[in-house]
Amino acid sequence: MYALIRKALFSLDAEQAHDLTIKTLKTLGRSPFNPLLKTLFACPTGSPKTIMGLHFKNPIGLAAGADKNGEAIEGFAAMGFGFIEVGTVTPLAQEGNPKPRQFRLPEAEGIINRNGFNNYGIDYLIENVKHANYDGILGINIGKNTFTSVENGKADYLICLNKAYHYADYITINISSPNSPGLRQLQYGEALEDLLQGVKARQKDLAEQYQKYVPIAVKIAPDLTEGEVVQIADTLQRHKMDAVIATNTTISRDTVSGLQNAEQQGGLSGKPLQQKSTEIIARLHQELKGQIPIIGSGGIDSVANAQEKIKAGAELLQLYSGLIYHGPHLIKQLVQQIK
């Protein structure tokens, strides 16, 4: 059945197909059709895990980028995900980069996007979260506005942290998108030190204010040298971050050279990212030694490569591109077999 749906969606521009999917899941998720949707997907509960002090019904999650504004939470939940991460969201609404900005590479089962954090702003997302009928684990992925300088970026993260804290089960600091100018600079040296110091201090204040501790994860890029991975791991440990998500999209085209759309600027996700992200997970695991949980993301499209990421050191997994190419049945397979 999904083969027919995919054929129809792939006849549309990639972003048009995404928008149509979100609208459909929003409508079905918030209507009397929701129980029917759950029956249609028929996903088992899976194997529960406790990570970051949170109880996940299974280790398979929806990656950020699928539901930027939290509009289709119930629809995605019906697929059987153990957790859902919405965003990336910024303090103020922004249009992102000019269209077209999403490109499929069907031969490689890859996607290139240069969206640039297009979203309706943190306030809009929070309203959607407040009204969502969802009792699973919800992550909110936050970033900075494009017009905010890298030097002033910390202020944007703190604004979003303040507003998301009460409504999120965990929060992700996105400093690794390749589509916001200069953003990846925040992964290194003093910039990362300053950002995490500010975030942890605000987390402490908010925990006292709301009388609950909300874990904070950091999402990193796959395009890191050995030395950079070591440095990031050390910084995450010193600041006692609650988790790390590895990885975001890649700017490398080594695995898709010569394919149509491979020359497009932006971050590459899907199968071409599979090996690179797993290598980063394995290297991170060596450095972190289990002190900080790793959430694996990047090119998951089968039970076999999902297990590779678990073996490399990931404790939870996230996917999005694999869902586009393989449909909701992939979620069912992963939930059934990944422990």
Swiss-Prot record:
UniProt cross-references to SUPFAM superfamilies, sorted A to Z: FMN-linked oxidoreductases
Role, per record: Catalyzes the conversion of dihydroorotate to orotate with quinone as electron acceptor.
EC number: 1.3.5.2
One Gene Ontology cellular component: plasma membrane
Gene name of the record: pyrD
Family: Belongs to the dihydroorotate dehydrogenase family. Type 2 subfamily.
Catalytic activity: (S)-dihydroorotate + a quinone = orotate + a quinol
Main location: membrane
Pathway entry: Pyrimidine metabolism; UMP biosynthesis via de novo pathway; orotate from (S)-dihydroorotate (quinone route): step 1/1
Membrane topology qualifier: Peripheral membrane protein
Protein name: Dihydroorotate dehydrogenase (quinone)
Cofactor note: Binds 1 FMN per subunit.
Claim: Hydrolase is one of the keywords in the record: no
Top-rank lineage group of the source organism: Bacteria
Binding-site residues, substrate: 68, 113-117, 174, 179, 248-249
HAMAP family in alphabetical order: DHO_dh_type2
